[in-house]
């Protein structure tokens, strides 16, 4: 049962694969409950009765919500039976989706455990994109920008690097280049034809807040006055907007966006651009 103070609850995530799907779904839902925090217990690669028995022991010792992605029917049955026995809720995250697919497609699944993580072309595409994005982070190796799918530009602390890595995890080769007043942009940026160039923008207020937090975490507030000076930051933002207008870069406001939301917006811009080029 949930603790009487209601400050936290146990969340058991049982998977026959990596558990990434469970983690993503459960965190998205848990974020809607600000007054309680889940204590995550993640059990990946559960593929035998012996492994499941160890999981069930831990669940019984710390009762809570049980979410699972298991394909083996015997394992599913044993897990559900145990949860019912000790009176705790359990739910298959992938089961209802598979039933919907099966009803619509009129065929059964292959039952391959971890099929989404096989070493296929998509996997190697992600690895290639990650390698590219790490090499072309923060304005490095600009001679290779034409090989990117997306080039992110923006002033400091507009989430260029984390967004680049997120996109790379989706198989999108992403470079990022900082925009700094008084420093000329790489000439390669002026002549790009293949990549989509997206200019990330945030309000001066947001940039100052993020930068102050950054400096405090580094213990480096002295000597960085211009970095958080209101007029200097205003000038940076204006400089970036002028460049975006001059070169026709797509402009994306990120002030109130998470990394995931920013990446999703970039992917939509990329898809729209690709569709227009095909028409």
UniProtKB/Swiss-Prot annotation:
Q: Which UniProt keywords apply?
A: Kinase, Nucleotide-binding, Serine/threonine-protein kinase, Transferase
Query: What reaction does this catalyse?
Result: N(tele)-phospho-L-histidyl/L-threonyl-[pyruvate, phosphate dikinase] + ADP = N(tele)-phospho-L-histidyl/O-phospho-L-threonyl-[pyruvate, phosphate dikinase] + AMP + H(+); N(tele)-phospho-L-histidyl/O-phospho-L-threonyl-[pyruvate, phosphate dikinase] + phosphate + H(+) = N(tele)-phospho-L-histidyl/L-threonyl-[pyruvate, phosphate dikinase] + diphosphate
E.C. number, please? 2.7.11.32, 2.7.4.27
Q: Which Pfam families match?
A: Kinase-PPPase
Q: Which residues does the annotation say bind ADP?
A: 154-161
Cite a single GO MF annotation: ATP binding
Q: Cite the NCBIfam families for this sequence.
A: PRK05339.1
HAMAP family hit by this protein: PDRP
What does this chain do? Bifunctional serine/threonine kinase and phosphorylase involved in the regulation of the pyruvate, phosphate dikinase (PPDK) by catalyzing its phosphorylation/dephosphorylation.
Family of this protein: Belongs to the pyruvate, phosphate/water dikinase regulatory protein family. PDRP subfamily.
- Protein name as it appears in the record: Putative pyruvate, phosphate dikinase regulatory protein
Q: Which organism is it from?
A: Rhodopseudomonas palustris (strain BisB18)
